[in-house]
């Protein structure tokens, strides 16, 4: 993993001005115009695919190993960014004052599979508050009889919270922007966002 800046002010911004970062580059099938990747690039891609865990090629062992690796990577990164030494630079004193919010997936099943253990262990390692239980789902059926999960959030939980948003992958960044706006309407202050991976090429950074 390439070294990432721990100074949030130096991170690129999404369309709403929110600073964000990521840990590994994710090569999409269109990356580089071909799909001839190095061993390291395949390893990074596999980490994201296996973490998401919704590929038929992902075994349960692959998924759990990817979750465990992500827990270590993310915990270490958060400790570096929000350590007491860097607190003044980033305007936050300790991780214990921050709340980790993992962006829910489209279904309850995928949300639990990706983020339940992940958020519990990252927060245990860093001392952050875990927002996982502030989200719930109701399930209905559409006109075709297919189940549809609807996300609900406990707005009172987020009042006054300083939030770090996390997603498994950033593509356009739109989902993070929309979710940040929703949290801020509930009274939270979104400090920054980061992801396990970022799809390349992108073309949506402010400086690109």
Give a label for each model feature.
Residues 1-95, 135-162, 172, 198-201:
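Active-site-facing substrate-recognition patch
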Residues 92-106:
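Short glycine-rich phosphate-binding loop at a beta-alpha junction
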Residues 99-100, 162-164:
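Structural motif
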Residues 118-142:
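Histidine/lysine/aspartate-rich catalytic loop segments that bind and position anionic ligands
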Residues 121, 178, 182:
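Active-site signature of alpha/beta-hydrolase-fold catalytic machinery across serine-
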Residues 132-140, 186-205:
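ATP-dependent adenylation/pyrophosphate-handling site
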Residues 168:
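Active-site-proximal glycine-rich helix-loop-beta segment
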Residues 173, 177:
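Glycine-rich SAM-binding Motif I of class I
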């Amino acid at each position: 993993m390439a070294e990432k800046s721990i100074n949030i002010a130096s991170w690129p911004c999404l369309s709403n001005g929110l600073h964000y970062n990521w840990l590994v580059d994710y090569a999409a099938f269109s990356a580089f115009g071909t799909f001839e990747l190095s061993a390291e690039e395949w390893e990074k891609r596999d980490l994201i695919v296996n973490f998401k865990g919704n590929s038929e090629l992902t075994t349960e062992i692959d998924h759990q190993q990817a979750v465990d690796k992500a827990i270590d990577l993310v915990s270490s990164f958060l400790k570096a960014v929000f350590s007491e030494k860097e607190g003044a630079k980033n305007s936050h004193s300790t991780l214990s004052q921050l709340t980790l919010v993992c962006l829910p997936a489209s279904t309850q099943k995928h949300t639990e599979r990706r983020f339940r253990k992940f958020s519990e262990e990252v927060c245990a390692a860093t001392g952050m508050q875990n927002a996982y239980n502030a989200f719930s789902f109701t399930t209905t059926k559409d006109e075709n009889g297919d189940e549809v999960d609807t996300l609900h959030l406990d707005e009172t939980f987020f009042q006054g919270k300083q939030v770090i948003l996390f997603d498994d992958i950033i593509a356009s960044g739109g989902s993070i922007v929309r979710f940040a706006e929703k949290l801020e309407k509930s009274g939270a202050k979104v400090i920054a966002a980061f992801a396990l991976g970022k799809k390349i090429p992108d073309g949506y950074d402010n400086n690109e």
